[in-house]
Amino acid sequence: MDQKDCSHFFYRPECPDINNLRALSISNRWLESDFIIEDDYQYLDCLTEDELIFYRFIFTFLSAADDLVNVNLGSLTQLFSQKDIHHYYIEQECIEVVHARVYSQIQLMLFRGDESLRVQYVNVTINNPSIQQKVQWLEEKVRDNPSVAEKYILMILIEGIFFVSSFAAIAYLRNNGLFVVTCQFNDLISRDEAIHTSASCCIYNNYVPEKPAITRIHQLFSEAVEIECAFLKSHAPKTRLVNVDAITQYVKFSADRLLSAINVPKLFNTPPPDSDFPLAFMIADKNTNFFERHSTSYAGTVINDL
């Protein structure tokens, strides 16, 4: 074998920025067993039937989407030779497994532990047009333009846009003193996704050549935001719990944050959310403990674009 190829057989630091994000993720690992989801059963009777249906739908989507992310991670890893990037994605896959297990716990809780009822619901709901629109849009974009750069834009949109309204809708439960454990899990998952979107933006900026035209990036962001807002509006109940207008504005604000992170001009110029928005604290650069109700400190500082 040529001597220049021998580096394949040992680890050599090449991407200090990605290595730092991997280290941050490792230092903040948590498990689905850290909280007891059974504590949230008491809140089920506090929801109206429409609200219960809404949150069942949200967690059906999140559970399915988490699997979609894991599938995409495997394909993205193959695009790079740097071991730091490979190692980062292995770490992210481990975290996504925890997310999937948590979503399963919460989903079953929303069906009062009735597994057969959960299966019946998911079999029908997974084909809901609002969910399928996201999946089909992604599949179409990957099929039409399989460039590495555009795949990364799509990954940024999956992690940074297609989860936003769901995270916000769950966070509104906290504002109403409901589902304390579910909200704790939501805090941790959304903060993990902050690291994931940061990593995707970092890899796109520093390790992906030949970026798409700004007009193309704006087109993809515009379509993704439109789909995400329609997703929320199609199922959000008329309820005291969720402010649909505030969430749709937050989706647009998040899109602008992500565009800025990849050095592309903003598209929506939407102002930041009001101080009472349940995810507003996540856009601040905080040095406080991310695990506010957890005994393990969440190390480091992450600015969340979600």
Swiss-Prot record:
Cited CDD domains: RNRR2 (cd01049)
One Gene Ontology term, aspect cellular component: membrane
Sequence positions that bind Fe cation 2: 96, 159, 193, 196
One Gene Ontology molecular-function label: ribonucleoside-diphosphate reductase activity, thioredoxin disulfide as acceptor
Catalytic residues (UniProt): 103
Alphabetical list of Gene3D superfamilies matching this protein: Ribonucleotide Reductase, subunit A
Top class in the EC scheme: oxidoreductase
Record GO biological process: deoxyribonucleotide biosynthetic process; DNA replication; release from viral latency
Binding site for Fe cation 1: 66, 96, 99
Subcellular location, record wording: Host membrane
EC number: 1.17.4.1
Keywords attached to this entry: DNA replication, Host membrane, Iron, Membrane, Metal-binding, Oxidoreductase, Transmembrane, Transmembrane helix, Viral latency, Viral reactivation from latency
Tree of life domain: Viruses
Cofactor: Fe cation
Catalytic activity: a 2'-deoxyribonucleoside 5'-diphosphate + [thioredoxin]-disulfide + H2O = a ribonucleoside 5'-diphosphate + [thioredoxin]-dithiol
Topology term for the membrane: Single-pass membrane protein
Function: Ribonucleoside-diphosphate reductase holoenzyme provides the precursors necessary for viral DNA synthesis. Allows virus growth in non-dividing cells, as well as reactivation from latency in infected hosts. Catalyzes the biosynthesis of deoxyribonucleotides from the corresponding ribonucleotides.
Quaternary structure and interacting proteins, as annotated: Heterotetramer composed of a homodimer of the large subunit (R1) and a homodimer of the small subunit (R2). Larger multisubunit protein complex are also active, composed of (R1)n(R2)n.
Family: Belongs to the ribonucleoside diphosphate reductase small chain family.
PANTHER family on file: RIBONUCLEOSIDE-DIPHOSPHATE REDUCTASE SMALL CHAIN, RIBONUCLEOSIDE-DIPHOSPHATE REDUCTASE SUBUNIT M2
HAMAP family: HSV_RIR2 (MF_04028)
Name this polypeptide is given: Ribonucleoside-diphosphate reductase small subunit
Source species of the chain: Varicella-zoster virus (strain Dumas)
Name of the encoding gene: RIR2
